Amino acid sequence: MAEDFVIEMLHITKEFPGIKANDDITLQLRKGEVHALLGENGAGKSTLMSVLFGLYQPEEGKILKNGKEVAIRNPNDANALGIGMVHQHFKLVECFSVLDNIILGVEPNKLGFLQKAEARKKVVALSEKYGLRVDPDALISDISVGMQQRVEILKMLYRDNEILIFDEPTAVLTPQEIDELMEIMRGFKKEGKSILFITHKLNEIMAVADRCTVLRKGKYMGTVDIKDTTKEELSRMMVGRDVQLQVDKKPAHPGDVVLDVEDVTIHNDQRKKDSVRDVTFQVHAGEIVCLAGIEGNGQTELVYGLTGLEKLSGGKITLDGKDITRESIRQRSKDGMSHIPEDRHKHGLVLDYSLENNMVLQRYWQPEFQKGGFIQSDKVREYSDKLIAQYDVRSGQGSSTIVRSMSGGNQQKAIIAREIDKDPKLLVAVQPTRGLDVGAIEYIHRQIVAERDKGKAVLLVSLELDEVMNLSDRILVMYEGEIVGEFDPKTTTVQELGLYMAGARKQGKESK
């Protein structure tokens, strides 16, 4: 019956040009439950939640709250109905304090004067009640990613939201912070709050959710009770086939040194400090070395230095015996370096170009694609069609598809196809599965292991500790711009890595 549900989204259809993101989807949320929303990348999960939060208007369908139809035209309407959302990419003002961010838009005032003391009192009370300890006066730019997420949660609680939407909330957290978040969700549930939880991590769904709704290609596949299902069954519902959840990987046989990084330092002029300090390591042919750590600890800057996007302040980089420290990005590519970037939109693709033009971004000047300075479109199309077939890149109009219209998983497949087909000596893969579903993750993991088995050197940068443990032959942990530990995945644990990632331990000091 309708009164059993605090929120009902009935027969929701949402269309974008050329695609039905949500096709007749029904989702019903009970009071006091954690309800997971699972689906492949591009299945329509975030779109559906954006409809509920008032960011999009559906073409068809209706939303009921406590059995009564409601109109949610914008996020203000959603907040007024007690619906709050923590987005995957936080919506915080970095130069504002924690307190200012929490009260932004709902500042208490009396006769036109801001009542900041009153707001502080409420924020402190909420943070103590829910175990979300924060410093109200700290600037957002000075606090950790895990702490920023607490601020986002407090924003919802400050607005007295009873229906809480979490969009991929654990993507940037340490194992210890993930455990804390799960405990916070359980606390909300005990209080009678209702939680919608978008995630692609099946173990988290099994740990905290009561029910799970599965979407596939914009359609509703079903809702299951977690106590009556398995991870394998959820994967099958999500992708329509059996999925290999563990990476099938033989022992590594490392060869010669391919990448040699010596005492690399990179100075951040904006923050007036070193973002990378005296980093030294090697990657051999036929092995996968993973850089693990919480986001913002120098991994991005180190990769920028390795790939030529950022200049070094000190140190030396050698690729297959050749000093490439001062070489251009194009020359590093010619020397045998491939790069799957962290931000596929900013550094991996030109979103308004066709798929075929994106496939030759690093090769269009080569003789096979141009003649007399003019690009040979038929050769580009032929090459792109080959990669699309070989790497199973799915898109609406094949090679002529504008990349912006493709799902994240297929955008990532296109980048991987382009970078692997260059036959590199070194593959630098930065968060290659971020935000992707189990089907796409399984595919990308297979490709990375296949490169290793062909004798390539692979440097993997990942925030996903399951991925780190499954794929790596060696693990390096970064904290505050330094490598604080090296580990064998066969002899370490996720909990031990978490302590090093949080700066609680450092090899050569506390631990060794």
What positions do the PLM features span?
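Glycine-rich phosphate-binding loops of nucleotide-dependent enzymes
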Residues: 2-512
